[in-house]
Amino acid sequence: MGAAAKLAFAVFLISCSSGAILGRSETQECLFFNANWEKDRTNQTGVEPCYGDKDKRRHCFATWKNISGSIEIVKQGCWLDDINCYDRTDCVEKKDSPEVYFCCCEGNMCNEKFSYFPEMEVTQPTSNPVTPKPPYYNILLYSLVPLMLIAGIVICAFWVYRHHKMAYPPVLVPTQDPGPPPPSPLLGLKPLQLLEVKARGRFGCVWKAQLLNEYVAVKIFPIQDKQSWQNEYEVYSLPGMKHENILQFIGAEKRGTSVDVDLWLITAFHEKGSLSDFLKANVVSWNELCHIAETMARGLAYLHEDIPGLKDGHKPAISHRDIKSKNVLLKNNLTACIADFGLALKFEAGKSAGDTHGQVGTRRYMAPEVLEGAINFQRDAFLRIDMYAMGLVLWELASRCTAADGPVDEYMLPFEEEIGQHPSLEDMQEVVVHKKKRPVLRDYWQKHAGMAMLCETIEECWDHDAEARLSAGCVGERITQMQRLTNIITTEDIVTVVTMVTNVDFPPKESSL
């Protein structure tokens, strides 16, 4: 084929594909309704303009319930690119007797009228009658389908031609923020009801919510904290992030109108809440301490690990950068899981941390090198910062443990005894960097074999020399050994076993860094 013929063929394909694309129905705005408008902090009714990427299709949707013949609308509004909604001019639910009815369509305000197809009768509010389709509708439909197939083939042929011609296409860098991800399919079809605020933090608040018959946690970010929400969503979406000791991720959504937008992150809900909240109200036994500490260490070790060759891709090493007892959640059986990845940093092969700002996190838990602003921007340096903070969390656990023969302290945050509840950066620098102080390890803790081993582990986690700190994997192994050994130790053997284990049995410090 000559150059002129190729050019003519390309022009023909472009014109055909353009015609096909222009022929589809464009959705610019949809009818908006929210039955839970007060709790979701949105308008109840109105017209919602639909936003999205230029190369993505936009749709309208409606969800409703049929309660003994009475129609209750749950939500109406804009719906992001969904192949199940393509070329539907009418909003029709086709599933057989769903618990919550759902339909989507293309075209301005096409969700104003909706119906339920399998019942062969219109299921709708009386205020939104649906006009029956005339007989020639099916004829028109059968005529359009082949034409659409032909248009699709033409578009594919054009794409193949272009792909073959451009063997090395240029890398395109987005010129604008890609915006929130599309709603999770799991969430989009199900009503999500906010119940009560459980916590407030730096980047928003956490709600207990109901998703059909189960409770979930909804972390709501204001739009100005979009970067934190985006970072947390991206970390949860990495390959291999499903782990027993990492908080289970369910979905992410954008809620509200274009004027008042909130960003939602939906995760599993754990009634016991954070480790910090639990320790305020409860003391822990030696076995409970070991279980919490070991599962927390396992979660952090998995987060720190670089795992190639997973079924869904390569899991990079991840530094949390805000380890604290507030960001460790407890399941009903006291298994710990790591949460809150708004500041997390992933380390992909061949890439450095670059100009990442090092002095982030909660001041009270900042390592000496962070407080000094003297961070080596390499992977292992960031992982060791996490380990310093983990040492402080282990101290919090030890301070509320009943194992030692002595009084159990009231719950206090690390350094609260030294510098109070609201330390400044200068306060932390003075105590941690210049005076090299750490929270007090009580003398009577040393009289319990397990607590004595734990104290040594804590000291090696918060060592002033970052390179001397233990790895998370090493901490997990040590705690397993502590629990096993203390279950067989007698009172007379304490000194002998502590000496033996301290000198011989502990795994090497740098087992995974």
UniProtKB/Swiss-Prot annotation:
GO terms for biological process: activin receptor signaling pathway; anterior/posterior pattern specification; BMP signaling pathway; cell surface receptor protein serine/threonine kinase signaling pathway; cellular response to BMP stimulus; cellular response to growth factor stimulus; determination of left/right symmetry; embryonic skeletal system development. Residues 162-513 are cytoplasmic. The keyword Metal-binding applies. It comes from the Eukaryota. Coiled coil: none annotated. The active site is at residue 322. Keywords: ATP-binding, Cell membrane, Disulfide bond, Glycoprotein, Kinase, Magnesium, Manganese, Membrane, Metal-binding, Nucleotide-binding, Receptor, Serine/threonine-protein kinase, Signal, Transferase, Transmembrane, Transmembrane helix. Its main location: membrane. The keyword Magnesium applies. It is found in: Cell membrane. Its EC number is 2.7.11.30. GO terms for cellular component: activin receptor complex; cell surface; cytoplasm; inhibin-betaglycan-ActRII complex; plasma membrane; receptor complex. Residues 1-19 form the signal peptide. The chain crosses the membrane at residues 136-161. Glycans are attached at residues 43, 66. GO terms for molecular function: activin binding; activin receptor activity; activin receptor activity, type I; activin receptor activity, type II; ATP binding; BMP receptor activity; coreceptor activity; growth factor binding. Part of a complex consisting of MAGI2/ARIP1, ACVR2A, ACVR1B and SMAD3. Interacts with MAGI2/ARIP1. Interacts with type I receptor ACVR1. Interacts with BMP7. Interacts with TSC22D1/TSC-22. Interacts with activin A/INHBA. This is Activin receptor type-2A. It comes from Homo sapiens (Human). The lineage of its organism: Eukaryota, Metazoa, Chordata, Craniata, Vertebrata.
